[in-house]
């Protein structure tokens, strides 16, 4: 049996931009992608702490060091600049492996700087 487990989480990221006219996706600073293990084009769920909205999209790379968290396309209607969000990805693995598995969790401050990563 395969279980769906949390793979990675960016916790309390601050939305820096929302672009309705862009094709889609969420742009994430390359430093944050690297710290979390989220890959460009990987499916992510975005949980808006500020308004409760939840949506699925895919990650794209924003410039390294930019601190960008930019929601694009139709999902831009579900966020506003300065909203706090959680970005999560999942993976599947056998139940035996899942018992000892630990996801990567990256805690961010209000400027999208890494406070803690584990």
Swiss-Prot record:
Its main location: cytoplasm. Keywords: Autocatalytic cleavage, Cytoplasm, Decarboxylase, Lyase, Pantothenate biosynthesis, Pyruvate, Schiff base, Zymogen. The lineage of its organism: Bacteria, Pseudomonadati, Pseudomonadota, Alphaproteobacteria, Caulobacterales. It holds the Pfam family Asp_decarbox. Transmembrane segments: none annotated. Heterooctamer of four alpha and four beta subunits. Binds 1 pyruvoyl group covalently per subunit. The active site is at 25 (schiff-base intermediate with substrate), 58 (proton donor). This is Aspartate 1-decarboxylase. Catalyzes the pyruvoyl-dependent decarboxylation of aspartate to produce beta-alanine. It is found in: Cytoplasm. Pathway: Cofactor biosynthesis; (R)-pantothenate biosynthesis; beta-alanine from L-aspartate: step 1/1. The gene is panD. Its EC number is 4.1.1.11. Substrate binds at residues 57, 73-75. One of its GO terms (molecular function) is aspartate 1-decarboxylase activity. The keyword Cytoplasm applies. The keyword Transmembrane does not apply. Coiled coil: none annotated. It catalyses: L-aspartate + H(+) = beta-alanine + CO2. Is synthesized initially as an inactive proenzyme, which is activated by self-cleavage at a specific serine bond to produce a beta-subunit with a hydroxyl group at its C-terminus and an alpha-subunit with a pyruvoyl group at its N-terminus. Belongs to the PanD family. The modification Pyruvic acid (Ser) is found at residue 25. InterPro entries: Asp_de-COase-like_dom_sf, Asp_decarbox. GO terms for cellular component: cytosol.
